[in-house]
Regions:
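Conserved structural core of kinase catalytic domains
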Residues: 73-112
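Residue-level recognition of conserved beta-strand positions in structured domain cores
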Residues: 32-34, 64, 74, 93
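Short, small-residue-biased leader/transition segments that mark boundaries at the very start
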Residues: 2-7
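C-lobe/activation-segment region of protein kinase-like
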Residues: 149-219
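Active-site acidic catalytic loop and adjacent metal/ATP-binding pocket
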Residues: 18-21, 29, 120-161
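ATP-binding glycine-rich loop module of kinase domains
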Residues: 17-52
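Short acidic, glycine/proline-rich loop/turn micro-motifs
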Residues: 39-45, 101-105, 163-167
Length: 220
């Protein structure tokens, strides 16, 4: 059967679940979104696109504007009559071996390149009017390649769409822990790409980050 040809391994289980699957010699990630409450089951069943559909649509959009994300494959919604039940989003497995948080776990001799690329890519998103609403330390993947730094952004179901100015743009970095030097590199690249003042962007990023919980060593 087809099921017997699929190798599955759980890689994350929390509010939602991630499983790595191998099929036909290729590796995929399947994200299953938890069943919402009864009111939202009705809303998602009739009026709103599911989180899986939004993830798929946003991934297509990211790739269209040149922002990296694992290649989307598809999504599947499960219903019970008019009520929405669960949804699943499938993408190819990323080849990027590291996440942003790894910058605090080990030393990278190309750390500056990674942070500058994050600043540049975030600017591309904001210039197009898109802001990732879960822009955290586990959702930015990276890899050093002969062509430069490869970034892939994941967990795309929640996204703001609209005009993003300097303050809102710098606030979007607030969930990323960073030393002053790390903020400096991101701010320089972000400001350059958007035509903003570097010092102002740096000050805003530091200020917004200072209000956030989840510090590393109570510092960053």
């Amino acid at each position: 059967s087809a099921a017997s040809d699929v190798y599955k391994r759980q890689i994350h289980k929390g509010r939602n679940e991630l499983r790595k699957m191998e099929y036909g010699g290729r590796e995929y990630v399947v994200k299953s979104f938890h069943r919402p409450n009864i009111i939202n089951r009705f809303v998602y069943g009739i009026f709103r696109p599911s989180k899986a559909k939004r993830s798929y649509d946003h991934a297509e959009l990211y790739l269209k504007i040149g922002v990296g994300t694992p290649q989307p494959v598809g999504y599947f919604n499960v219903r019970s009559g008019l009520l929405f039940d669960k949804s699943y989003y499938v993408s190819c497995l990323s080849t990027c071996p590291y996440v942003y948080n790894d910058l605090f776990r080990r030393k990278f001799d190309y750390e500056e390149e990674v942070l500058r690329e994050i600043g540049r890519v975030t600017a591309v998103l904001h210039e197009h009017g898109y802001a990732h609403k879960d822009y955290g330390r586990e959702n930015i993947l990276f890899q050093k390649t002969p062509e430069g730094i490869k970034l892939e952004i994941v967990d795309l179901n929640r996204m703001f769409v609209g005009t993003i100015g300097m303050k809102a743009g710098c606030k979007n970095f607030e969930r990323l822990p960073a030393t002053p030097q790390m903020h400096r590199w991101m701010a320089e690249e972000y400001a350059k790409a958007r035509g903003f003042d570097v010092e102002k962007c740096f000050e805003l990023m530091v200020a917004y980050r200072s209000t956030q919980p989840g510090k590393i060593d109570n510092l960053y």
